[in-house]
């Protein structure tokens, strides 16, 4: 099944860039966007994505807190954190929150696309 992706990031520029990147892949669809974790949870319940990409540092609710809730509401939906911030504990905190992988924004977008492709294939 092709990915239906929810993008959760407080930067409209990042959301736009990710939408263009994902929708350039054959069959991929961005089913929704949100600008903070709280809105991301609401949007996920509305659009039922089969993949979620979210930022760490956002207003209202950060990505880790949102991921904890999303992993309980939608345990089969892979969540990947796409962030420019890192801490020494981020990987372990992310795994504990239900996040499958942390990808740095400073890396190539191909890494994120490959991750989406692999996790959606594994979930099928």
Locate the predicted segments by residue.
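Conserved acidic segment of CheY-like receiver
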Residues: 2-14, 18-22
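Short hydrophobic/Thr-rich beta-strand motif most characteristic of the beta2 strand and flanking loop
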Residues: 27-35, 43
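Acidic catalytic/metal-coordinating carboxylates
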Residues: 36-39, 62-66
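Conserved phosphotransfer cores of two-component systems
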Residues: 45-47, 69-76, 97
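Active-site beta3 strand of CheY-like receiver
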Residues: 47-53
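Receiver (REC) domain active-site loop signature in two-component systems and cognate sites
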Residues: 58
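Alpha4 helix (beta4-alpha4-beta5 surface) of REC/receiver domains from two-component response regulators
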Residues: 65, 86-103, 107, 111-114
């Amino acid at each position: 099944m092709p990915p239906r992706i929810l993008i959760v990031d407080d930067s409209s520029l990042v959301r736009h860039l990710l939408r263009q990147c994902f929708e350039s892949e054959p069959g991929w669809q961005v089913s929704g966007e949100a600008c903070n974790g709280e809105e991301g949870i609401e949007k996920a319940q509305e659009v039922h994505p089969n993949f979620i990409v979210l930022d760490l540092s956002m207003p209202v609710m950060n990505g880790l807190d949102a991921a904890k809730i999303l992993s309980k509401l939608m345990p089969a939906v892979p969540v990947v954190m796409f962030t420019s911030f890192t801490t020494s504990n981020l990987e372990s905190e992310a795994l504990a929150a239900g996040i499958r992988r942390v990808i740095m924004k400073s890396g190539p977008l191909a890494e994120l696309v490959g991750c989406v492709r692999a996790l959606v294939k594994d979930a099928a």
